[in-house]
Amino acid sequence: MPYEFLEDIATADIAFSAWGKDLEETFIAASDATMNVMVENLDSIQPLERREIQLQNEALDMLLFDLLQELIYYKDSEKLMLRIHQIQIKKEEHQYVLKAVALGEKLDPNRHPTRADVKAVTLHRFQLVKTDRGWETQIILDI
């Protein structure tokens, strides 16, 4: 599990740190951590529905922010619990472009015991940094 929940960062919110050897791995880890805040067992989410996500942003950290917000949007608008299965991040001219395939299914309380209802990603202490081992992010979610 390339993420950990940070108990001492926020009281009414949930904070976590996620990491990976490259940007793609880090974005997937942060996406999984966000879903894991909402659903106890990520493996209970079956790949029954597919959504293609395409995002652009001039700032790399805000591209991650946008991706997590997109997953929360699908949860709120379609009751879809999605996990990122393929992702590509590249720099094109003056912006970063993300293309991802998310797979999942509609939330079923009988099969998906829930933990918390994530409302949004906050910008408070939000960061994405390159490290000796790859990339690391710290994120606080509003619940």
Predicted stretch roles:
Residues M1-I143:
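N-terminal intrinsically disordered, cationic/polar leader segments
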